[in-house]
Regions:
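Non-catalytic DNA-binding core/recognition domains of DNA-processing enzymes
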Residues: 3-84, 101, 181-186, 192-195, ...
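Extended accessory and catalytic-adjacent subdomains in large enzymes
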Residues: 81-400
Length: 400
């Protein structure tokens, strides 16, 4: 079939790789005098077969067997068998993304939410300050008195001091832009925590991506975007109701910066028609690192989570991120190949965007409230076996 089937144009190395994937199945079946077409009925040899596989990429390749069943005329492993087989797999992959210990994960989530809530509490003032700066930036960019008057008038100064290293004695307009960028980062991080989307997918979210719908009388909250991991580019993620405020914060900042971009690029459309990326670059004329030389449709480069924490160093308290012995034990249990040079008791947890995705996957399955199929949908995986790899060891985590 691989030579003369629907897609005959394959290289020799591709054929070799595919045969390598199948070899353990045939070898163990032959050893036990079991027809390969009867493999689904013999779970007792799954563990022996699984022991011969290393790394998730070859394992994930088994999912092709399901799709080929009708074409080749028989089934080697069906969907249910793949799910059972995956439970015997021992992940031997030094690149397994670390699982964030619950205490640290909950702390970062709480701080992100507080940052967003604080911003929304002064959002009217933020809009007023932004518009005032737009009207007067040519004359007042270095007028510290005017800048502080605006910050104080609209109660923005308190939040700048709480969340950034703002000093009224050295107040500048770029301080304001940095605060907006920080809130934008916090909102994106909050969304990723609850949606499990890839950070690249979060960066592609556009204005107006959030919606609510009623299903069987229950209100469901959705984020609409794009993904490259499914046949259809368009995708939706089910999210917590609390994600709405993160979207709201992003929309406010997007509206302000888009108003500047319209003048720079001569855009005639309203924001609701244009639908720019929510995580929009800095376009305000006084902003540090403003995006005038960027195209509005340019997809921003992903900045590592830990780098963002260093840039916006008042979001998290380093002491709260220090790994305790309990944190370390949980991290090692969930990720046996954890890099203990990076993750040690007493050191601050080193964050990465993909950790939010894996941690969420583990927590969802461990809760017992989410099915494997629902997790697969949320992660935008082609098969449940891939999702189970993400949630590896979830059964070791107990929620009360």
């Amino acid at each position: 079939y691989w030579l003369w089937g629907a897609s005959p144009k394959v290289s020799a190395i591709t054929i070799v790789n595919r045969c390598t994937i199948l070899k353990p199945l045939f070898h163990v079946c032959s050893k036990h005098n079991i027809l390969i077409s009867e493999l689904s009925k013999h779970e007792e040899i799954y563990e022996e077969i699984a022991a011969q596989y290393k790394g998730k990429r070859r394992i994930a390749g088994l999912q092709e067997l399901v799709a080929l069943s009708k074409d080749i005329g028989f089934t080697i492993l069906d969907e249910d068998s793949l799910r059972k087989f995956s439970k015997y797999l021992v992940v031997n992959d030094s690149n397994q993304t670390p699982y964030i210990p619950p205490r640290i994960w909950a702390y970062q989530l709480e701080r992100l939410e507080t940052c967003i809530d604080d911003f929304l509490s002064i959002s009217d003032g933020v809009i007023s300050v932004f518009n005032s700066f737009m009207d007067n930036h040519n004359q007042t960019n270095e007028n510290r008195k005017f800048i502080n008057e605006q910050f104080n008038k609209y109660n923005v100064s308190v939040m700048l001091q709480k969340w950034t290293n703002f000093d009224p004695d050295t107040a500048k307009m770029p301080n304001f832009s940095k605060y907006l960028s920080m809130v934008s980062f916090a909102s994106i991080a909050y969304i990723v925590n609850f949606s499990l989307m890839r950070i690249s997918e979060a960066y592609l979210l556009r204005y107006g991506c959030f919606s609510k719908t009623l299903i069987d009388g229950q209100e469901i909250f959705l984020i609409h975007g794009v993904t490259s991991k499914t046949e259809k580019g368009e995708a939706s993620w089910v999210v917590s109701p609390s994600v709405e405020k993160a979207i709201k914060a992003l929309e406010i900042i997007c509206e302000l910066r888009f108003s500047c971009a319209k003048k720079i690029f001569g855009i005639k459309q309203d924001i609701t028609d244009y639908k720019p990326y929510l995580h929009i670059p800095v376009f305000e004329p006084w902003g540090s690192g403003r995006g005038e030389n960027e195209r509005l449709e340019h997809i921003r480069s992903t900045i590592p989570y830990n780098n963002q924490i260093s840039t916006f160093d008042k979001i998290f308290d380093p002491k709260e991120l220090q790994i305790t012995q309990v944190d370390f034990n949980i991290a090692c249990k969930m990720t046996p190949n954890l890099d203990t040079e990076i993750y040690q008791v007493g050191k601050a947890w080193h964050f990465a965007w993909h950790q939010l995705r894996r941690t969420g996957a583990v927590n969802m399955l461990a809760s017992g409230l989410i099915t494997e199929q629902s997790l697969q949908y949320q992660l935008k995986h082609a098969n449940t076996i891939m999702s189970l790899y993400y949630a590896n060891n979830y059964y070791k985590l107990k929620f009360k």
